[in-house]
Swiss-Prot record:
Classification via Gene3D superfamilies: FMN-linked oxidoreductases (3.20.20.390)
Organism: Korarchaeum cryptofilum (strain OPF8)
Gene Ontology cellular component list: cytoplasm
Catalysed reaction, written as an equation: sn-glycerol 1-phosphate + (2E,6E,10E)-geranylgeranyl diphosphate = sn-3-O-(geranylgeranyl)glycerol 1-phosphate + diphosphate
Listed EC numbers: 2.5.1.41
Swiss-Prot/TrEMBL keywords: Cytoplasm, Lipid biosynthesis, Lipid metabolism, Magnesium, Metal-binding, Phospholipid biosynthesis, Phospholipid metabolism, Transferase
Function: Prenyltransferase that catalyzes the transfer of the geranylgeranyl moiety of geranylgeranyl diphosphate (GGPP) to the C3 hydroxyl of sn-glycerol-1-phosphate (G1P). This reaction is the first ether-bond-formation step in the biosynthesis of archaeal membrane lipids.
CDD domains: PcrB_like (cd02812)
Name this protein carries in UniProt: Geranylgeranylglyceryl phosphate synthase
Pathway as given in its UniProt record: Membrane lipid metabolism; glycerophospholipid metabolism
The family this protein is said to belong to: Belongs to the GGGP/HepGP synthase family. Group II subfamily.
Record bears the keyword Ubl conjugation: no
């Protein structure tokens, strides 16, 4: 069974810890990998928007020394690909105003990804307000989805599904002051069959729980774990929120 199939068949919302290679050295990567493993995380995402391709292979190998959790690439560009990962979110930034982020980067990366034998998970990537002020939003030249217009997110999600994509990543941006609204998650869940990944601005167990209850298949936490005083405790509290 593929990793994607296991993700879709999971009976509960999965917790993914995001590691940004641009912000970590080997020891930092190992520390967060231990926290993810001991805290009960289900997945580790590796990637970022600026400079994340630098030493990505070394970071992933460091993570693998501390954890058996599946590693999924969350690429910010064509340099965010590694043969040492278990899968890659093969993403199209649908609400970018720059065609490079919609299809050109994907075309450049597709053949190397296939040659590496990486499992590709076709994913629509949508950046929601206030994500335009995040690194991903700035680099990706986005026209952000308004927070109070969940029907716009649904329109993109429906188009993604009709194009054959199987997942959608609703992103508010790393460290966002406000996460993706639960109502937006709920509407996409009710009106499509896409797997839903939600990330950005999820700083508390309550925010995580609300998005899980709205229908998210995967919750992604990164900045809260990286910048917190106790990474293990942070992972555990997020995991407990998904159990309740």
């Amino acid at each position: 069974m593929s990793l994607e199939e296991r993700m879709r068949k999971a009976e509960r919302t999965l917790l993914a810890v995001l590691l940004d290679p641009a912000k970590l050295d080997d020891e930092g990567a190992r520390k967060l990998a231990r926290a993810a493993s001991e805290g009960g995380a289900d997945l580790i995402f590796v990637g970022g928007s600026i400079g994340a391709g630098f030493r990505i292979n070394e970071i992933i190998l460091s993570v693998k020394k501390e954890s058996n959790i599946p590693i999924i690439l969350f690429p910010g560009n064509v340099d965010g690909v590694s043969p040492y990962a278990d899968a890659i979110l093969f993403m199209s930034l649908l609400n970018s105003t720059n065609p490079y982020w919609i299809i050109q980067a994907q075309a450049l990366a597709a053949i190397p990804i296939r040659r590496m034998g990486l499992e590709a998970i076709p994913t629509a990537y949508l950046i929601v307000e206030p994500g335009q002020r995040s690194a991903a939003g700035w680099v990706g030249s986005v026209n952000p989805i308004p927070r109070d217009k969940p029907e716009i997110a649904l329109a993109y999600a429906t188009a993604a599904e009709m194009l054959g994509m199987r997942w959608i990543y609703l992103e508010a941006g790393s460290g966002a002051e406000a996460p993706v609204p639960s109502e937006m998650v709920r509407l996409v869940r009710e009106r499509t069959n896409l797997g839903i990944i939600v990330g950005g601005g999820l700083r508390s167990p309550e925010l995580v729980r609300e998005r899980a209850e709205a229908g998210a298949n995967v919750i992604v936490v990164g900045t809260h774990i990286e910048e917190g005083r106790d990474a293990l405790a942070s992972v555990r509290e997020m995991k407990e929120a998904l159990k309740s």
